[in-house]
């Protein structure tokens, strides 16, 4: 059976660290930012680790 192709949409949105963790950007940043607090906007800049319940599913798509 041939290899599965990598999902391009996912490839653009995640980054795999050297230790194998999957990192993603946070949501709620693109628009309507005037209604959000400075703290919310600052914390949304950081990348976060993908939740453990999603990791297995996403690794199959990569």
UniProtKB/Swiss-Prot annotation:
GO biological process, alphabetically ordered: translation
Region of interest (Disordered), residue spans: 25-62
Keywords: Ribonucleoprotein, Ribosomal protein
Gene3D superfamilies: 4.10.410.60
Bias (Basic and acidic residues) ranges: 53-62
A Pfam family this chain is assigned to: Ribosomal_L35p
Similarity section: Belongs to the bacterial ribosomal protein bL35 family.
The protein, known as: Large ribosomal subunit protein bL35
Native organism: Mycoplasmopsis fermentans (Mycoplasma fermentans)
Origin organism lineage: Bacteria, Bacillati, Mycoplasmatota, Mycoplasmoidales, Metamycoplasmataceae
């Amino acid at each position: 059976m041939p290899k599965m192709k990598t999902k391009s949409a996912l490839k653009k949105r995640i980054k795999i660290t050297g230790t194998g963790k999957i990192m993603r950007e946070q949501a709620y940043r693109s628009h309507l930012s005037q209604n959000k607090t400075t703290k919310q906007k600052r914390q949304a800049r950081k990348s976060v680790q993908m939740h453990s319940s999603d990791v297995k599913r996403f690794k199959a798509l990569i």
